[in-house]
Design a protein with these regions (language model features):
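N-terminal secretory targeting modules
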Residues: 1-196, 201-202, 207, 214-219, ...
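Conserved SGNH/GDSL esterase-like catalytic core that processes O-acyl groups on lipids
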Residues: 14, 37-43, 58, 66, ...
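Soluble or luminal CAZymes and related metallo-dependent hydrolases
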Residues: 37, 174, 245-252, 291-298, ...
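Alpha/beta-hydrolase-fold catalytic nucleophile elbow
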Residues: 269-270, 316-317, 365
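Catalytic His-Asp segment of secreted/periplasmic serine-dependent ester chemistry enzymes
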Residues: 276, 319-414
C-alpha cells in the first residue's frame, strides 16, 4: 500500500439517485428510455469535495441487457458544458481495461484516475457506449448531459451535441445516463453528508450547502444528493409516471445513501408525497391515506439502517404546502389543501422532536413559512406552494445548523 492510500480515503463528492427509465404502460416515459447505439454521453457535474484522484460508479441496476462501455474519460470541465480542458483529460479504466461490460442489475466502479480536483470544480465525464442497448438506468438531477454519435471521449468540444433534458408536466429533468456516483481520494477527516428526499430537495441544495460550509471554514465535508422528484417514504410511485417517481425511500435508502463512499451523515426531507398523493384526483383508487404509525415506522427503519452502519441521521421538518394544487397532465387542480388533509404533517413534525424519535437530531425549517399564514411557504420562496425557488433553496441551506458538521467524524467506510 503506497503512502497516498495510507493517508487518504475515498469520499463521495457527487451522486444522483437512479430511476428506471423503461417504458411505462401509458408511454409517459418513452422519451426517457435512452436509446444507445454507438453514442457518447458527456455529463458535467459540480464536485463538493476535492482530492488527488477520482473514480466513477456506472449503474445498470434497472437494465435487462448488459451495458457495454467501450471507452471512458474524465476531465476538468470548460465554461461550455459541452467542452473540457484538454490538458486535464484522463482515461478511465475498469479492472485495468479501457472497457467494461456491466451486467444487467449491477453497477461497476472504475479504477482510480489521477486527476487533482477541488471542491466546487466542474468534472466532466464522457462515456462511449457501443452496441444497441436500452439504457434503463438514469438519474434526473445534478448534472448537465449531452449525447453525440461515435466515440467522443477525447474530443475537446462536442459540436453536434444533443442536450439530454426532459421537460414534462411533472417537471424539468436533467437526464444523466448510468453515472450515479463520483468519488475523490480525499484528505484524512473528509466525509460525506447525503441529502435524501423528494422534489423539495431535488434541486441545488447540495451545492448551496457545500458552498456555504466552505465559506464558513468547513472544508472537510462533501454534500451529495439522493433525492427523487415525487418520491415517497413508505411506498413506490404509482400512476402514469410511476417509474419516474422512484422506489420507496425505505427500499432505496441502503443503495442510494449507505453505499456512498465516506458517508457518515444523512439529512432526510421525505414524506410530503406520502401525505399528499393519496388525496390527488389522478391517483384515486391507487392509494389509501397513510397513517401516523406507518410513517413513523418508515422513519424508524431509516434510522435503524443508518445507525447499523454508524451513520448519523437528521430528520428535517416537513414544510407547508398550502396553495399547492398539483395541476398535472392538463387536468386542472389535482388537489386542494385543507386543514384536514394537512393534519398529519404537524403531528410528524412534533414526533421528530420527541424523545420517541430515534434520529440523531431534528432540523426545524419553520422560518420558510409565511409568518401571517404558517400553513403556507413565504411567497418568494416557492414556485407553486411546495417547491422552492432559488431564494427558497438558499434559505433552506442557511437553516441547516452548522454545528452538526463541526463534530469530529467517526471512521467512515471507503
Amino acid at each position: 500500500m503506497d503512502e497516498i492510500s495510507i493517508r487518504s480515503h475515498w469520499v463521495s463528492a457527487w451522486s444522483t439517485s437512479p430511476i428506471d427509465a423503461s417504458l411505462s404502460e401509458t408511454g409517459i416515459l418513452d422519451r426517457l428510455g435512452v436509446a444507445v447505439t454507438d453514442v457518447s454521453a458527456r455529463t458535467a457535474v459540480q464536485l463538493t469535495a476535492g482530492g488527488t484522484h477520482v473514480r466513477l460508479t456506472l449503474s445498470n441496476v434497472f437494465g435487462v441487457l448488459p451495458l457495454h462501455v467501450a471507452a471512458c474519460t474524465v476531465a476538468i470541465g470548460a465554461d461550455d458544458a459541452r467542452g473540457i480542458e484538454p490538458d486535464t483529460l484522463r482515461t478511465v479504466t475498469f479492472g485495468g481495461e479501457g472497457h467494461v461490460r456491466i451486467a444487467a442489475g449491477t453497477s461497476c466502479t472504475s479504477d482510480a484516475a489521477a486527476l487533482p480536483v477541488t471542491a466546487g470544480q466542474t468534472l466532466t465525464v464522457t462515456v462511449f457506449y457501443r452496441g444497441i442497448n436500452a439504457m434503463r438506468t438514469i438519474g434526473l438531477i445534478g448534472g448537465c448531459s449531452y449525447a453525440e454519435l461515435g466515440n467522443c471521449t477525447r474530443r475537446p468540444l462536442l459540436h453536434l451535441a444533443i442536450p439530454m433534458q426532459h421537460t414534462a408536466e411533472t417537471g424539468a429533468y436533467e437526464v444523466i445516463p448510468a453515472l450515479t456516483e463520483i468519488d475523490v481520494l480525499a484528505a484524512p477527516g473528509t466525509h460525506a453528508c447525503v441529502i435524501f428526499g423528494d422534489s423539495t430537495v431535488a434541486n441545488e441544495l447540495p451545492r448551496l450547502l457545500a458552498a456555504r460550509l466552505r465559506a464558513d471554514g468547513i472544508e472537510n465535508v462533501s454534500v451529495t444528493q439522493a433525492a427523487i422528484k415525487g418520491d415517497r417514504l413508505v411506498a413506490d410511485g404509482v400512476g402514469r409516471a410511476a417509474k419516474l417517481l422512484g422506489g420507496a425511500g425505505v427500499k432505496r435508502f441502503e443503495r442510494d445513501v449507505l453505499a456512498q463512499a465516506g458517508a457518515d451523515m444523512v439529512l432526510v426531507k421525505l414524506g410530503a408525497n406520502d401525505l399528499i398523493h393519496p388525496h390527488c384526483r389522478s391517483k384515486q383508487g391507487l392509494l389509501t391515506p397513510v397513517t401516523f404509525a406507518q410513517m413513523t415506522a418508515g422513519y424508524r427503519a431509516l434510522a435503524d439502517m443508518a445507525h447499523a452502519q454508524g451513520v448519523r441521521i437528521w430528520f428535517c421538518e416537513l414544510t407547508p404546502w398550502k396553495g399547492y394544487t398539483r395541476n398535472l397532465f392538463g387536468r386542472g387542480d389535482d388537489i386542494q389543501w385543507s386543514p384536514e388533509l394537512d393534519a398529519l404533517r404537524p403531528e410528524l413534525n412534533a414526533w421528530f422532536q420527541s424523545a420517541d424519535c430515534p434520529a440523531d437530531g431534528y432540523i426545524p425549517l419553520d422560518a420558510l413559512a409565511d409568518p401571517d399564514d404558517p400553513d403556507a411557504l413565504i411567497a418568494t420562496y416557492t414556485t407553486d406552494g411546495v417547491h422552492h425557488t432559488p431564494a427558497g433553496q438558499r434559505a433552506l441551506a442557511a437553516l441547516i445548523p452548522e454545528d452538526i458538521f463541526r463534530e469530529t467524524p467517526k471512521e467512515v467506510h471507503p
